[in-house]
């Protein structure tokens, strides 16, 4: 069984071009999710509002100011469809894989129905928690 963590991007970013894993390190929340994923999952990817699925140590990208928070439902559906296709291309939606979503509902709300149509198991360990509660959840497990 392979475990893959999916970590949402964050508003706080470095200003200079960086690898995706480093770009979001300005955010304490991202740092906690990253640390948890690196310690507990076999692989992890970043869910970017602008780029979709990013390899953490892939090519450097420029800082950007884009989020799904204010996106329409249709925009979120289009984004989710693109992310789903990217995950398929990475063979990340197979029967022997469990996806752990470390993101808010803006990032998984429209993606979850697509994932539920596959044989992949999906877990959202911090579902229903507020930001402070999520930080405490990660602190307790790192």
Q: What residues fall within each predicted segment?
A:
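Peripheral peptide segments
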Residues: 1-142
């Amino acid at each position: 069984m392979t475990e893959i963590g999916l970590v949402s991007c964050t508003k706080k970013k470095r200003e200079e071009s960086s690898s995706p894993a480093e770009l979001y390190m300005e955010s304490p929340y991202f740092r906690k999710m990253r640390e948890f994923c690196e310690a507990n999952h076999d692989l992890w990817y970043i869910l970017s509002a602008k780029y979709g699925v990013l390899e953490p140590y892939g090519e450097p990208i420029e800082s950007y100011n884009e989020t799904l928070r204010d996106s329409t439902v249709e925009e979120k559906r289009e984004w989710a469809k693109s992310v789903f296709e990217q995950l398929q291309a990475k063979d990340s939606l197979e029967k022997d894989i469990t996806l752990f979503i470390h993101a808010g509902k803006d990032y998984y709300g429209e993606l979850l129905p697509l994932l539920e149509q596959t044989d992949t198991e999906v877990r959202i360990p911090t579902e229903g928690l507020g930001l402070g509660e999520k930080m405490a959840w990660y602190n307790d497990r790192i």
